[in-house]
């Protein structure tokens, strides 16, 4: 029957953790995207690093195989929403950074759509089960929203925020005062 597969971490930390420039850059990204810890940032960096490595390895392939695999990789990244255009090149993939990935997190998109007042409130709404994608509750702020799912993000049907979104509640309190 065999032993179960050992689960390993999906992220790789920095090679040298105490470089001031990197620490400051990490703090800015953690604040901008409302991340809970640096591990979430390192996960994004690792995923982008793997996509860039794939693109570099495609450059060494013969032209026939390279073109088909290149199209597949570009289509995947386009569906994920990480690259903006469907006719991108390997240079566009090599130019990706962790911000391209962090922009596709559910937490960021909920905030940018205006469903939450702050990026931190967006995280709280997701964790507490107030956000749904296509009517299906999603409670993970790190969920990567595909390009086709972006328009389906809304409040969960039974959520009290469905009738009174956070932005409207704040406006009502100001008008009463």
Swiss-Prot record:
Gene3D superfamilies: RNA-binding S4 domain
One GO BP annotation of this record: translation
PROSITE patterns: RIBOSOMAL_S4, S4
CC per GO annotation: small ribosomal subunit
Listed SUPFAM superfamilies: Alpha-L RNA-binding motif
Annotated region (Disordered), positions in chain: 158-177
CDD domains (UniProt xref): S4
GO molecular function: rRNA binding; structural constituent of ribosome
Keyword Transmembrane: no
Keywords, comma-separated and alphabetical: Ribonucleoprotein, Ribosomal protein, RNA-binding, rRNA-binding
Domain S4 RNA-binding: 104-166
Regions of compositional bias (Polar residues) in chain numbering: 165-177
Xref: InterPro entries: Ribosomal_uS4, Ribosomal_uS4_arc, Ribosomal_uS4_CS, Ribosomal_uS4_euk/arc, Ribosomal_uS4_N, S4_RNA-bd, S4_RNA-bd_sf
Entry-linked HAMAP family: Ribosomal_uS4_A (MF_01306_A)
Family listed: Belongs to the universal ribosomal protein uS4 family.
Function, in words: One of the primary rRNA binding proteins, it binds directly to 16S rRNA where it nucleates assembly of the body of the 30S subunit. With S5 and S12 plays an important role in translational accuracy.
PANTHER family in UniProt: 30S 40S RIBOSOMAL PROTEIN (PTHR11831), 40S RIBOSOMAL PROTEIN S9 (PTHR11831:SF5)
Subunit record text: Part of the 30S ribosomal subunit. Contacts protein S5. The interaction surface between S4 and S5 is involved in control of translational fidelity.
Protein's UniProt name: Small ribosomal subunit protein uS4
Organism whose genome encodes this protein: Sulfurisphaera tokodaii (strain DSM 16993 / JCM 10545 / NBRC 100140 / 7) (Sulfolobus tokodaii)
């Amino acid at each position: 029957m065999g032993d179960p597969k050992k689960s390993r971490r999906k992220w790789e930390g920095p090679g040298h953790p105490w470089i001031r420039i990197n620490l400051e850059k990490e703090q800015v990204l953690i604040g901008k995207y409302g991340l809970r810890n640096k591990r979430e940032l390192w996960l994004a960096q690792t995923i982008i690093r793997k996509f860039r490595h794939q693109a570099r390895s495609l450059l060494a392939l013969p032209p026939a195989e390279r073109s088909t695999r290149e199209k597949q990789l570009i289509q995947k990244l386009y569906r994920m929403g990480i690259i903006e255009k469907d006719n991108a090149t390997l240079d566009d993939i090599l130019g990706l950074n962790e911000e391209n990935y962090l922009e596709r997190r559910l937490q960021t998109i909920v905030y940018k759509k205006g469903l939450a007042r702050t990026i931190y409130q967006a995280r709280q709404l997701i964790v507490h089960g107030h956000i749904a994608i296509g009517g299906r509750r999603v409670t993970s702020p790190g969920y990567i929203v595909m390009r086709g799912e972006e328009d389906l993000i809304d409040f969960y049907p039974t959520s009290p925020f469905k009738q009174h979104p956070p932005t409207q509640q704040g406006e009502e309190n100001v008008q009463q005062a």
